[in-house]
Swiss-Prot record:
Keywords: FAD, Flavoprotein, Glycoprotein, Oxidoreductase, Signal. It is an enzyme of class 1 (oxidoreductase). Its EC number is 1.-.-.-. The lineage of its organism: Eukaryota, Fungi, Dikarya, Ascomycota, Pezizomycotina. Glycans are attached at residues 30, 53, 72, 114, 314, 329, 461, 465, 478, 514. It comes from Aspergillus flavipes. This is FAD-linked oxidoreductase ffsJ. The gene is ffsJ. Its cofactor is FAD.
């Protein structure tokens, strides 16, 4: 009786199309899982007196605690029903389909007074995955009942792929083991890949950077402290500050442990299940299986040079535009010196593991002169390790979360940076973005110098020097960047555009918790227009699926280029029943798919947020 009372409310909350699984089905699954199946309720529910249009008793103490932590990323990733970007919790086109506080002021009573807290796009139930058998049970349940499965690692997906109304959520954050290998040989392989770390699927960058530092090595990862290192980041590409010299996440991962949709517990690497390994190295999350752990090569801990460039807050628009011009002009020269990081018209932070302090100062001299001449701050310093950069610069710059954010990105080919005419076209596009209220940024995080078996480029053979370059080749100072045999033209499946690019252009839009439908549509249309314009500027390039908006046209080509056909074939091989599906993921074409990540679509029909916002 106790189990029935616990599960029934969530069953009753599901729309008809997601009630194919009976109460008996859910109870049977709960028994299989040793009573570890739990209902999902909205994070902010304790603040509301109405839930799904029925009376509900608020909990003031619980509400105050939620309000205190509502915009904290570390708090959110550890909450079952919280996502870093709140579009994953809502059906954006329908204001009533949400249970949100005001992220600008979580104590604002206007968000929850006399308003119904509705389930939105949250899953129905979740499992805290502890063993491979948990995932096997979930896949068997999904095959029997036609229930959608969503996979939640840290919940950072801009497209809401890790949520889904009525779905069964597999939460992997609880898998947090860490192992350091002085020398690692993948299963069934004969050749070791060198120093490596094996990470449970739930380990995030803050945790792995700390662990790596304790073992005097460097993990090459992303900039979001709470992003999972084994989730969508590495499965889709995975870029970061050190990618210039050491490659993307997909270049560095040497083995995955996962459960495939047939329920089998597998190891995938270059020596066994090699086609699956290829698909996992860029084919996207929530597509080919549920990752339990991943193993990545690491670098020795070593000093790096950091450049900090910031204009004063009162900088004129013309000064900001000139600074953005400088970033465009120096993207290629800085890429030659392995400078990696992020820049926009206000500030830039870059780091390189290849230059000494005097060399770094020479490389950055023009930029430092510019910002200091305009009343800003510019300097270069040596840090003892990437971990010092992470703790000193990345952690303090982490922004508040819990609001709606949609991203646009396009990988800009070297050819646009290499000529004066290309730079002019790009700057004209950046000016247009500013004129419509977007804040363009450049991610200097492509694998520009990474070299391996025919892809990327060695810094002993750079042929794209811009006429604006004042730096010398890193090869004369540091030798060539270490080539890795695990690289190679055919070994990863993300968009090939990564291999011929020096930067990624990004922008984002967001809206308030109480934004009207017309306001949402206007912002979304602006973002879409920006992506269409830059695609015309750089046709044949691609986008990073993790940081793309949900309205990308011809997304198969944009996200995977010529790799898509093989990925689609492998999707049919490894998931013939289509038990895993998500928005704009491999194999998601067609109607009637069990997709996650539909939270921004236009109307709720049969339990799904369907149609188009724009």
């Amino acid at each position: 009786m106790r189990l029935t009372r616990a599960l029934t409310p969530a069953i009753l909350a599901l729309p008809a199309a997601h009630a194919a699984a009976s109460l008996q089905d859910w109870q049977s699954l709960n028994t299989t899982l040793d009573h570890r199946l739990h209902a999902v309720t909205p994070l902010a529910l304790p603040c509301f007196s109405i839930y799904n249009n029925h009376s509900h008793a608020p909990n003031e103490d619980a509400c105050l605690n939620i309000q205190d932590h509502y915009t904290n990323a570390s708090y959110r990733v550890d909450q079952v029903s919280a996502y870093v970007f709140s579009q994953s919790e809502t059906c954006s086109p329908i204001p009533s389909q949400q249970c949100e506080l005001d992220p600008s002021d979580p104590s604002n009573p206007a968000a929850y007074t006399n308003i119904s807290c509705n389930t939105g796009s949250l899953p129905a139930y979740y499992i805290d995955v502890q063993h491979a058998s948990d995932v096997t049970a979930a896949f068997h349940f999904a095959a029997k009942t036609n229930t959608a499965i969503s996979i939640k690692n840290s919940g950072h997906d801009y497209n809401g792929r890790s949520s889904g109304p009525g779905s069964l959520s597999l939460r992997t954050r609880t898998l947090r083991s860490t192992t350091y290998h002085p020398s690692f040989t993948p299963a069934s392989c004969k050749t070791p890949t060198g120093k490596a770390v094996t990470l449970g699927a739930g380990v995030n960058f803050h945790e792995v950077y700390t662990f790596a530092h304790e073992n005097k090595v460097t993990f090459v990862g992303g900039s979001g402290p709470t992003v999972g290192a084994s989730g969508g980041w590495v499965l889709t590409g995975g870029h970061g500050v050190l990618s210039r010299a050491y490659g993307l996440g997909i270049d560095r991962v040497v083995e995955f442990e996962l459960v495939t949709p047939d329920g089998e517990h597998r190891i995938a690497n270059a020596c066994q299940n090699a086609d699956l390994f290829w698909a996992l190295r860029g084919g996207g999350g929530s597509t080919f299986g549920v990752v339990l752990s991943s193993t990545h090569r690491v670098e020795p801990e070593a000093p790096l040079s950091l450049a900090y460039l910031a204009l004063p807050p009162n900088a004129s628009s013309s000064t900001s535009a000139a600074f953005l011009d400088l970033l465009v002009n120096y993207t290629l020269p800085w890429a030659e010196d392995a400078w990696g990081g992020f820049g926009n018209a206000a500030a830039t932070i870059l780091a390189t593991p290849l230059l000494s302090l005097p060399e770094a100062k020479t490389s950055m001299a023009t930029a430092i002169d510019f910002v200091t001449a305009h009343g800003g701050t510019g300097y270069v310093e040596t840090l003892s390790s990437f971990y010092e950069m992470y703790t000193k610069y990345i952690v303090p710059s982490a922004s508040a979360v819990g609001s709606v954010r949609f991203n646009h990105n396009w990988i800009i080919p070297n050819s646009l940076f290499a000529t004066a005419s290309g730079q002019k076209k790009l700057r004209k596009h950046l000016d247009w973005m500013g004129s419509v209220g977007l804040v363009p940024g450049l991610l200097e995080t492509t694998p520009y110098l990474y070299s391996g078996n025919g892809h990327g480029r060695s810094n002993n053979n750079n042929s794209n020097n811009s006429s604006t370059s004042t730096s010398t080749s890193t090869s004369s100072k540091n030798g060539s960047v270490k080539p890795y045999a695990y690289g190679g033209k055919e070994t990863t499946s993300s968009t090939p555009a990564w291999r011929n690019s020096a930067a990624v252009l990004i922008a984002e839009v967001g809206w308030a918790f109480n934004a009207t439908l017309s306001e949402k549509k206007a912002l979304a249309k602006t973002l879409v227009e920006a992506s269409e314009r830059v695609r015309e500027l750089a046709p044949g390039s691609g986008a990073y699926a993790n940081e793309a908006h949900p309205w990308v046209e011809d997304w198969q080509d944009a996200f995977w280029g010529g790799n898509y056909r093989r990925l689609a074939d492998l999707k049919k091989k490894w998931d013939p029943k289509g038990l895993l599906g998500c928005w704009h993921c491999v194999g998601s074409e067609g109607e009637g798919k069990k997709e996650t990540g539909t939270a921004w679509r236009a109307e709720v029909v049969g339990g799904k947020c369907l149609g188009r916002l724009i």
